[in-house]
Amino acid sequence: MGRGKIEIKRIENSSNRQVTYSKRRNGILKKAKEISVLCDARVSVIIFASSGKMHEFSSTSLVDILDQYHKLTGRRLLDAKHENLDNEINKVKKDNDNMQIELRHLKGEDITSLNHRELMILEDALENGLTSIRNKQNEVLRMMRKKTQSMEEEQDQLNCQLRQLEIATMNRNMGEIGEVFQQRENHDYQNHMPFAFRVQPMQPNLQERL
């Protein structure tokens, strides 16, 4: 009894769909390998699952197969994308060339071919550029002056604190020196006093002298 013909439509059950995909995918890759070996054919197969996972087989370099495809068909894959990319590259190159020309003009180079209107536009651009440069220069100078003033004020504060510290140290030293001189003066004064006026540590009993 032969197998019934399977209706070709999307399998709704996700589990059954995944099982069928795995079996059919393996079968396609197997057939691709077989035909490449049996018939010496150049075969390339790329399969993308619904999940985005890719499976592939290529009997030779995929790049070589694509090059041969391009030569034989005269068509390139992703022509629209490549065309847009080429247009974008050409636009960038053109913009870069124009910027190089403008830069040379701003430097005073290659301006002999410019007409009066173009020279006026160039002059305005230079004046605007000079104005921007002067404004930036003035801004930098203001910042430098402000920073210098702040540093000078900080230096003045440090000098004031240092001076106060020096004065306090000097006063302390003078006080210590004054105490030393006072002690010396007291000692010298006692040494020059008459013997009768000197304070004796002990006075003998006057009755014992009599």
UniProtKB/Swiss-Prot annotation:
Q: Which InterPro entries match?
A: MADS-box/MEF2_TF, MEF2-like_N, TF_Kbox, TF_MADSbox, TF_MADSbox_sf
Q: Identify the Pfam families for this entry.
A: K-box, SRF-TF
**Keyword DNA-binding belongs to the record:** yes
Question: Where does the MADS-box domain start and stop, copy by copy?
Answer: 3-57
Tissue spec. comment: Petals.
What positions does the domain K-box occupy? 82-173
A single GO CC term for this protein reads: nucleus
Q: Which UniProt keywords apply?
A: DNA-binding, Nucleus, Transcription, Transcription regulation
Among the GO molecular function terms of this UniProt record, one is: protein dimerization activity
Q: Which PROSITE patterns match?
A: K_BOX, MADS_BOX_1, MADS_BOX_2
Q: Does the keyword Glycoprotein apply?
A: no
Gene Ontology biological process terms from the UniProt entry: positive regulation of transcription by RNA polymerase II
Database matches in PANTHER family: SERUM RESPONSE FACTOR HOMOLOG (PTHR48019)
**Protein name, entry field:** Floral homeotic protein FBP1
| Organism encoding this protein | Petunia hybrida
Q: Which gene encodes it?
A: FBP1
